[in-house]
Amino acid sequence: MVVDFWTWEQTFQELIQEAKPRATWTLKLDGNLQLDCLAQGWKQYQQRAFGWFRCSSCQRSWASAQVQILCHTYWEHWTSQGQVRMRLFGQRCQKCSWSQYEMPEFSSDSTMRILSNLVQHILKKYYGNGTRKSPEMPVILEVSLEGSHDTANCEACTLGICGQGLKSCMTKPSKSLLPHLKTGNSSPGIGAVYLANQAKNQSAEAKEAKGSGYEKLGPSRDPDPLNICVFILLLVFIVVKCFTSE
């Protein structure tokens, strides 16, 4: 499948001109883009989308909600001209051995979502002052999907770019906890309860350690019976010795 990139460019230009009529931006595909490898002055933007693939060998088709899209953006302030380099990451067929990475194809709705999110990123990064900020449009499943993401046949996963392939690095605290911590909700959030319990446990452990250290290092308050017996025997021995010498 081949992306109709001419249509993408036209849609991108319409969205940019609607927001910034005097700005000039170009959008180009670049299959050599690498994550975190940017020239000076460039910025990076990554998103995922719902797309379709077709195997060029067996003609099998499949859908994925983990199609990764990497963009590098640059804007020249004095000329008000900007550039976008975009890379679409492919997937391989599960059924064919030695299959190649196939490029994704997107529905018109998914295409609009991808480009709208890209334009919002540009407006936020380069035209932040006085620009109405909109949240990123989420991925919408066009069909029901079964099973987990096929990381073994995902090009982005093999390159360490796909979020599904880097769960340990991408994990963040749930946003649902933030309102409880910021607004002072009457019922404490999970994060607040966790922090309170953690502080309480640390305080208890400190007290226990301090108490145990005092018992080991400090002097004993109770007299030792053995020492008393030795003292009495020594006293008796001295008295007997005195009488014997007389």
Curated annotation (Swiss-Prot):
Ranges per topology, Cytoplasmic: 1-224
Zinc finger (3CxxC-type): 48-159
SMART domains from the UniProt entry: zf-3CxxC
TM region positions: 225-245
Induction: By interferons. Upon influenza virus infection.
Tissue expression from the record: Expressed in circumvallate papillae and testis.
Subcellular location(s) of the protein: Membrane; Cytoplasm
Membrane topology type: Single-pass type III membrane protein
Cellular component annotations (GO), alphabetically ordered: cytoplasm; membrane
Family listed: Belongs to the TMEM7 family.
Function of the protein: Chaperone protein that facilitates the trafficking and functional cell surface expression of some G-protein coupled receptors (GPCRs). Promotes functional expression of the bitter taste receptor TAS2R16. Also promotes functional expression of the opioid receptor heterodimer OPRD1-OPRM1. In addition, acts as a potent IFN-inducible suppressor of pathogens including lyssavirus rabies, influenza A or yellow fever virus. Mechanistically, associates with the viral replicase, binds viral RNA, and thereby suppresses viral genome amplification that replicates at the endoplasmic reticulum.
Subunit structure comment from the entry: Interacts with TASR16. Interacts with OPRD1 and OPRM1; the interaction promotes cell surface localization of the OPDR1-OPRM1 heterodimer.
Name this protein carries in UniProt: Receptor-transporting protein 4
Native organism: Homo sapiens (Human)
